UniProtKB/Swiss-Prot annotation:
GO terms for molecular function: tryptophan synthase activity. InterPro entries: Trp_synth_b_CS (IPR006653), Trp_synth_beta (IPR006654), Trp_synth_beta/beta-like (IPR023026), TrpB-like_PALP (IPR001926), TrpB-like_PALP_sf (IPR036052). The modification N6-(pyridoxal phosphate)lysine is found at residue 83. Tetramer of two alpha and two beta chains. It catalyses: (1S,2R)-1-C-(indol-3-yl)glycerol 3-phosphate + L-serine = D-glyceraldehyde 3-phosphate + L-tryptophan + H2O. This is Tryptophan synthase beta chain 2. It comes from Methanothermobacter marburgensis (strain ATCC BAA-927 / DSM 2133 / JCM 14651 / NBRC 100331 / OCM 82 / Marburg). Pathway: Amino-acid biosynthesis; L-tryptophan biosynthesis; L-tryptophan from chorismate: step 5/5.
Length: 390
């Protein structure tokens, strides 16, 4: 494994971390083929996380939009989002490696909750780094992490969001590699993380492919998923990369590309190195990383997983910015049509679906939307944006 997707990916980290990454790669390559490890992983995903998740035909939404819409229900998983697929996988691997402590970064809080849950499950200490701005936005999730035994460490530097939480987590790891595993929550970071996280999230795509073939007898025309770091998207895209299936990623368009206040890294960024890998980043002319903005705490990251940069460059996938206002409309649309409240991250994918369906050439097409998480965590924020005082 060279950790490259075309020219993207690789390892750009301090020399002190190279041995830890090499140890992790060797363990991942070994245990991902180990029968007992895979039996354990399958057991915990089924009995603890709640897999397989359903592929739900959203009939009301389909009728309204003029497409055959299916929702891959990752929102039904324990802890409320797809993140648990990866945290169970990595925490199990860390245990097999003899690590006793997990550290993680989190933006929306979903990865932090899923890491805290995995730590409790496997009896490991957990420290979660979270930007103070995100701590304020996601107070409920902070409590959920703490009640599961994790220590939440607020990060007050820089933009006080996900980027800065990652920086602090990496500093911690440099000083604690002997007994600590850094459980990165998305398909970003230095090799082997993008490949490893994709591996643990690919269960989404494998299930969705099998389910749609059983229901429809053929593959879908299009897959839509939201993209921050990009793990839920790569998880579902992975099973369809070699097929004639259109792949669309919905990025956090914030207040619009022209405003500069957005998280649309692929739509408006450029090549650069961030958090250990070469990908697309939001940066100024001097290469300084810009702050990202999205109504969704999980999409305000100024980078993106390197495989997404490769998929865009090769034309295999396209990426569309979705504004905060459009995402909020998507949140209301799914809630009112189906009684399903999506996470604000997933609402970007619903809004992207709405724009997709408005094009005459897409009428009647079969679309799978990856519903990466549920909206419980966003109720107070969404209510405030909709002018409702709770």
């Amino acid at each position: 494994m060279d950790g490259k997707f075309g020219k993207y990916g690789g390892i750009f980290v301090p020399e002190l971390l190279i041995p830890a990454l090499e140890e992790l790669e060797a363990a991942f390559l070994h245990y991902s083929k180990d029968r007992r490890f895979n039996e354990d992983l399958e057991h915990y995903l089924r009995e603890y996380a709640g897999r397989p998740t359903g592929l739900y035909h959203a009939r009301n939404l389909s009728e309204k939009l003029g497409c055959r819409v299916y929702l891959k229900r990752e929102d039904m998983l324990h802890t409320g989002a797809h993140k648990i697929n990866n945290t169970i996988g990595q925490a199990l691997l860390a245990g097999y490696m003899g690590k006793r402590r997990l550290i993680a970064e989190t933006g929306a809080g979903q990865h932090g909750i899923a890491t805290a849950a995995a730590g409790a499950l496997f009896g490991m200490d957990v420290d979660v780094y979270m930007g103070t701005e995100d701590v304020e936005r996601q107070k409920l999730n902070v409590f959920r992490m703490e009640i599961s035994g994790a220590r939440v460490i607020p990060v007050d530097s820089g933009s006080r969001t996900l980027k800065d939480a990652i920086n602090q987590a990496m500093r911690d790891w440099i000083s604690s590699v002997e007994d600590t595993h850094y459980l990165i929550g998305s398909t970003m970071g230095p090799h082997p993380y993008p490949t490893m996280v994709k591996h643990f999230q690919s269960v989404i795509g494998r299930e969705a492919r099998e389910q749609i073939l059983e229901i429809e007898g053929e593959l879908p025309d299009t897959i839509i998923a939201c993209v921050g770091g990009g793990s839920n998207a790569i998880g579902i895209f992975s099973a369809f990369l070699d097929d004639d299936v259109e792949l669309i990623g919905a990025e956090g368009g914030g207040e619009g590309i022209e405003s500069g206040n957005h998280g649309a890294t692929l739509s408006a960024g450029s090549e650069g190195v961030l958090h250990g890998s070469l990908s697309y980043v939001l940066q100024d002319d001097d290469g300084q990383i810009n702050e990202a903005h999205s109504v969704s705490a999980g999409l305000d990251y100024p980078g993106v997983g390197p495989e997404h940069a490769y998929l865009m460059e090769t034309g295999r996938a396209m990426y569309e910015p979705i504004t905060d206002a459009e995402a909020l409309r998507g949140f209301k649309l799914l809630s009112r049509c189906e009684g399903i409240m999506p996470a604000l991250e997933s609402a970007h994918a619903i809004a992207c679906l709405e724009k997709y369906a408005s094009k005459p050439e897409n009428r009647g097409k079969t679309v799978i939307v990856n519903l990466s998480g549920r909206g419980d965590k966003d109720m107070f924020l969404a209510a405030g944006l909709l002018g409702v005082d709770l």
